[in-house]
Swiss-Prot record:
Cellular component terms per the entry's GO annotation: tRNA methyltransferase complex
Any matching Pfam family: Methyltransf_4
Name of the encoding gene: trmB
Active site, UniProt feature: D131
Lineage, broadest ranks: Bacteria, Pseudomonadati, Pseudomonadota, Gammaproteobacteria, Legionellales
Family indicated by similarity: Belongs to the class I-like SAM-binding methyltransferase superfamily. TrmB family.
Name of the featured protein: tRNA (guanine-N(7)-)-methyltransferase
Catalytic activity: guanosine(46) in tRNA + S-adenosyl-L-methionine = N(7)-methylguanosine(46) in tRNA + S-adenosyl-L-homocysteine
EC number: 2.1.1.33
Pathway: tRNA modification; N(7)-methylguanine-tRNA biosynthesis
Binding site for substrate: K135, D167, T204, K205, F206, E207
Signal peptide start and end residues: none
Length: 237
């Protein structure tokens, strides 16, 4: 998969003292380096052999990723983010609460998936509130496209999941069409539409405010090769 168009724009934003402290003092404790010569071995990187690994792409300020890691210590979480403020915020939280089941990579998600993630190695991938690029001329920048999903399918194991959430209805329809068109995926919602928000996905302050204002949020959960059973605790779908 050759993707030259980026789904994000790096802007010079303000970084708080706490976020900078996270980057300067504790990032090295959690970071997986993209420039390592071989794909990652998750048993080695997380220091345990019996845990499933879930990837979150674009974790923002890390609120959901932090909560899920704290609530599911039996699971490994790998967060991918390019914006330094969010990385610093998450790392500071991880350090403060001594959370050990999270690793972070500060790099483009497509390149990470292409070169660093072994095939059939993930219990799931979650993408919460990706940039909707709402103007029609920018739709080509949307992260979730057919080629991208085809790559994800190769990285998750049979019975693994892809969980997306968006507050932009047009993007939700696009994501539903893309996921439904992938023959290796099955919609967790039997009626073929959107899923209720799973308990496993924390409700963010942003969502709570949106709900009060009447804004919608659409969750989509698809499973790879649904007929393959899986008793691993990290796949609650």
């Amino acid at each position: 998969m050759q993707r030259k168009i980026k789904s994000y724009v790096l802007r010079a934003g303000r970084i708080s003292n706490r976020q900078q402290q996270g980057l300067d003092l504790w990032l090295e404790d959690y970071e997986l380096k993209f420039d390592s010569p071989t794909p990652w071995n998750f048993a080695k990187e997380f220091g345990r052999h019996d845990a499933d690994t879930i990837v979150e792409i674009g974790f923002g300020m890390g609120t959901s990723l932090f909560a899920m890691a704290m609530n599911n210590p039996q699971c490994n979480y790998l967060g991918i983010e390019v914006h330094k403020a969010g990385v610093g915020s998450l790392v500071a939280d991880l350090h403060e609460h001594q959370i050990s089941n999270v690793r972070v990579v500060v790099h483009d998600a497509v390149e990470v998936l292409q070169t660093k993630i072994p095939e059939n190695s993930l219990a799931g991938v979650q993408i919460f509130f990706p940039d909707p690029w709402h103007k029609k001329r920018h739709h080509k920048r949307r992260l979730i496209q057919s080629e991208f999903i085809q790559m994800l399918v190769k990285k998750i194991r049979p019975s693994g999941f892809i969980h997306c959430a968006t507050d932009w209805e047009d993007y939700a329809e696009h994501i539903l069409n893309v996921l439904s068109s992938e023959s290796a995926l099955f919609n967790q919602q039997k009626e073929g539409g959107y899923s209720p928000r799973p308990d496993s996905r924390p409700l963010t302050k942003f969502e709570q405010r949106g709900e009060r204002l009447g804004h919608g949020v659409w969750d989509l959960v698809f499973i790879k090769n649904k007929e393959v059973t899986n008793d691993k605790a990290c796949n609650s779908y």
